[in-house]
Curated annotation (Swiss-Prot):
One of the early assembly proteins it binds 23S rRNA. One of the proteins that surrounds the polypeptide exit tunnel on the outside of the ribosome. Forms the main docking site for trigger factor binding to the ribosome. GO terms for biological process: translation. It comes from Albidiferax ferrireducens (strain ATCC BAA-621 / DSM 15236 / T118) (Rhodoferax ferrireducens). HAMAP family: Ribosomal_uL23_B. The keyword Repeat does not apply. One of its GO terms (cellular component) is ribonucleoprotein complex. Transmembrane segments: none annotated. It comes from the Bacteria. InterPro entries: Nucleotide-bd_a/b_plait_sf (IPR012677), Ribosomal_uL23-like (IPR013025), Ribosomal_uL23/eL15/eS24_sf (IPR012678). Keywords: Ribonucleoprotein, Ribosomal protein, RNA-binding, rRNA-binding. This is Large ribosomal subunit protein uL23.
């Protein structure tokens, strides 16, 4: 029982741009070990269905689910001038049992 659009309904060029970068942090690593989930920075207008299709297309793994978090950019000061960091949309992609996704080489 599949919900939402099928993998074939998406433009492959768009799917290649949906995933901006993997997020490798202490929190993301803990989540990956505990719940077999991988964290990505994604486009602001990316949908859960697009993210799922992009991960399946690029990494050839089966995705169980996708959770998305929008993080507002912080206001930062540089001397007298005020700047602002970009808003970030994070996707926590949970993989099906038995699936594994290695984003980088293991440090020795």
């Amino acid at each position: 029982m599949s919900h939402g659009p099928n993998l074939t309904t998406f433009d492959e060029g768009r799917l290649m741009q949906v995933l901006v970068a993997p997020i490798v942090s202490e929190k993301a690593t803990m989540i990956a070990e505990k719940s077999n989930a991988v964290t990505f920075k994604v486009l602001q207008d990316a949908t859960k269905y697009e993210i799922k299709a992009a991960v399946q297309l690029m990494f050839k793994v089966e995705v169980k689910g996708v959770s998305v978090v929008n993080t507002k950019g912080k206001t930062k000061r540089f001397g007298k001038s005020v700047g602002r960091r970009d808003n970030i949309r994070k996707a926590y992609v949970t993989l099906k049992p038995g699936q594994e996704l290695n984003l980088g080489g293991e440090a020795a």
